[in-house]
Amino acid sequence: MAASWSPLVTLRSAARSRLTGRGVGCGARVIAIFPPAPGPRKPLWKAYTVQTLEGVRPTAASEAHSRALAVCHGPLAHYDFLIKAQELKNDEHQRRVVQCLQKLQEDLKGYNIEEGGLFSKLFSRNKPPKGLYVYGDVGTGKTMVMDMFYEYVEVKSKRRVHFHGFMLDVHKRIHRLKQSLPKRKVGFMAKSYDPIAPIAEEISQEASLLCFDEFQVTDIADAMILKQLFENLFKNGVVVVATSNRPPEDLYKNGLQRANFVPFIAVLKEYCNTVQLDSGVDYRKRELTPAGKLYYLTSEADVGTVMDKLFDELAQKQNDLTSPRILKVQGRELRLNKACGTVADCTFEELCERPLGASDYLELSKNFDTVIIRNIPQFSLAKRTQVRRFITLIDNFYDFKVRIICSASVPISSLFVYQHQDSESDQSRVLMDDLGLSQDSAGLSMFTGEEEIFSFQRTLSRLTEMQTEQYWIEGDRSRK
């Protein structure tokens, strides 16, 4: 066996491993996210769409799922098949949600949004069924059961997207639409123009079913348009299925100008049934076969040399030279100091100390299947900006199945230390002054750090799963 620092020998024999589900008991990850293929211009948001593993050589990790697809006709039968095959453990909380999704799958058979204007859709006899909003703690299987549903639902056009990526695309569409408007003539008042309705119509023409993973609202720009956007989508006949860590009532909790967001909650509950999936088990943290050693402490001897060797071994499999890499992101340049083919060697400072955002991390995820992240510090609310960037980075890497090798100052379980931050800290006072907020606003989540603490629980759970053999198999783009 190779030296203990190398995960690659473990991975070479990983195809012989038995499927244990997405974090054992949480089911197989039955789909993967790929970067969009080059070709004619497609809707921007398809870059975030999850697609099935078509044309990929099957491995032991996908055999049970493939057998289930061959004989089952719905998510409930698929779930029972995996339990009988001992790939999942029966979880009554999961089963209850799968039963709801089974009913929705049956109700949606043959459903399609009718052509015509909004008026004709409102009075159509082909009324869409209510969607489903599934919420619960991290690692309980929400994504797995939604993915089972997505595999079987029979509608003409459907899309499965990460909610953060979807909203990023919506803002791009808004910008593009505004840019296409005629320029205002000097001396003339510009007419107000609302781009939300036409964008909702555009999306409705592309999909009659939207499945959202990780439905969460942390950005005020998203919060202010959600009611109008989704009201238009629902009235156009779009059916929504979503997973979230929060119940609808807690979305954007303590957010800035939340009073303007609250009406969206009523809209969501009018068009979606709500069901909780909370078995009290984080299946990602159960015993799984590790993919070798992928997480190092910076205090370990020669850790820098070890990670250099890991990069060199990975780079040898690339048909490329090691050099700096420049990525184009929305007209900007994102420079990485060291990359080879689809492997990048980065420091935490490169990725999270610079002013980068979701669009940058999305571009990284599409260009690299393996990323080394060196010198991750221990986080606290004193470094809130870096915390948010790291959460967004890991969310994007996880969704695209990017494989990571890390060095950090502390173990995963200790990465975040909560220290109560006085709302009267210098940083908070400056921000409140800049926003023109009174002391009464000190309880907002942007000052208490509540949203970061909540989201980091998901990050820790995902980091744990990203160390497993199964995750590394699924992230191997050379098989695709």
Swiss-Prot record:
Pfam family of the protein (one): AFG1_ATPase
Sequence positions that bind ATP: G136, D137, V138, G139, T140, G141, K142, T143, L209, L210, C211, F212, D213, E214
Cellular localisation: Mitochondrion membrane
GO CC term (a single one): mitochondrion
Major subcellular site: mitochondrion
Enzyme class at the top of the EC tree: hydrolase
GO biological process: mitochondrial protein catabolic process; mitochondrial protein quality control; mitochondrion organization
A GO molecular-function annotation: ATP hydrolysis activity
Similarity-based family: Belongs to the AFG1 ATPase family.
The protein's assembly and partners: Found in several complexes of 140-500 kDa. Interacts with YME1L1. Interacts with COX4I1. Interacts with COX5A. Interacts with TP53; mediates mitochondrial translocation of TP53 in response to genotoxic stress such as mitomycin C treatment.
Protein's job: Putative mitochondrial ATPase. Plays a role in mitochondrial morphology and mitochondrial protein metabolism. Promotes degradation of excess nuclear-encoded complex IV subunits (COX4I1, COX5A and COX6A1) and normal activity of complexes III and IV of the respiratory chain. Mediates mitochondrial translocation of TP53 and its transcription-independent apoptosis in response to genotoxic stress.
Protein name listed in UniProt: AFG1-like ATPase
Lineage: Eukaryota, Metazoa, Chordata, Craniata, Vertebrata
